Structures are given as structure tokens and as C-alpha cells.
């Protein structure tokens, strides 16, 4: 929506001002800082990951492009107003979803579809998602994408969690 367009415009302006090489330096430094902060927060909750998966690799490794290709080959995409749409309503969603915007940039949903494909192509038996309760609408959307890709929906497990107040040693933990 409008937020994505605004962010895209900010990124384009930063690239214009910095140039590609300096933009990459700033981008990578910011990325590493954010990941370190996330890892630190998770560690504070007693959660340590063996590995992180880079969303960027979905594009560089071709998962998004392959997922869109599969949906296209299966007849589940159409063009409207310059954008590429997924026929999500064919699989029970309340509306069709854009996967490639008019400007040729794939949407976050397209990345989610690519990630789903990558999970199974990398040999995982199932995909487990944990969403905040405010993302409940994503369940039907993601399962629709799985069906469009020809994947077994039973191999996808989605849990919803509700926001809560956390305490450690009787003290409330600041969440943000």
C-alpha cells in the first residue's frame, strides 16, 4: 500500500544521495545492527537460534521468481492495471492478492510465497509459522499460496499468539 510506496521512495532517495557502493555499506551496517539487536532481545527471553534465514536470499537464490513462475504455470496469476495478481479467491481467500506491483517490484506476500517454496525445496517436512493474532487473515492467504504452488497444506502449521505482559523475577519486562 502507501507505506510500501513511501519506503520505496525513501530507499531510492538514499541510493541517489549515497550512490550504490556507499548505500550498500550503510544498508549492511544497519542490517547487522538490527540483527544483533534482535538476537540480543531473543537471548534475553532464553531463545537462541542456530541460524537465521535471510529474506534477501529469496530473491538472490530465485525462490520468489520460481514461486511466481509456478503460480503462473498453474494458471493462478493474472495481470490487472500493470500488476500481477494471485487468484487467492480460488482457494478461499476473501480477495485476490498482488504479487508483483506495477513498478515491477514483488510484494512482501510474494516473498512469503517464495519462503514457503524454499522451506520445502530445502527439505523441511513441514513449515511452522507463529503469527501475532492481528495477522490471523494471513492464514487463509498463505494456505491459498501453498495450494497454488501444489504443496500439501497439511504440512503447514500456523499458530496464533496473543500479546502479553512478560515478567522476569517478579519484574515487568519492557517490550519496546
Task: Enumerate the predicted regions with their spans.
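NTP-dependent nucleotidyl-transfer catalytic core
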Residues: 1-176
Amino acid at each position: 500500500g502507501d507505506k510500501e510506496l513511501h519506503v520505496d521512495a525513501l530507499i531510492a532517495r538514499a541510493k541517489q544521495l549515497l550512490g550504490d557502493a556507499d548505500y550498500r555499506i550503510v544498508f549492511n551496517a544497519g542490517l547487522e545492527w538490527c540483527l544483533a539487536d534482535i538476537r540480543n532481545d531473543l537471548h534475553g527471553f532464553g531463545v537462541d537460534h542456530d541460524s537465521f534465514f535471510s529474506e534477501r536470499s529469496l530473491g538472490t537464490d530465485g525462490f520468489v521468481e520460481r514461486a511466481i513462475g509456478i503460480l503462473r504455470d498453474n494458471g493462478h496469476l493474472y495481470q490487472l492495471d500493470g500488476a500481477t495478481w494471485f487468484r487467492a479467491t480460488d482457494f478461499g481467500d476473501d480477495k485476490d492478492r498482488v504479487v508483483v506491483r506495477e513498478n515491477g517490484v514483488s510484494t512482501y506476500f510474494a516473498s512469503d510465497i517464495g519462503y514457503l517454496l524454499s522451506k520445502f525445496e530445502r527439505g523441511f517436512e513441514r513449515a511452522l509459522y507463529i503469527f501475532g493474532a492481528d495477522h490471523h487473515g494471513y492464514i487463509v492467504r498463505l494456505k491459498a499460496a501453498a495450494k497454488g504452488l501444489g504443496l500439501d497444506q497439511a504440512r503447514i502449521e500456523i499458530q496464533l499468539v496473543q500479546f502479553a505482559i512478560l515478567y522476569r523475577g517478579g519484574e515487568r519486562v519492557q517490550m519496546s
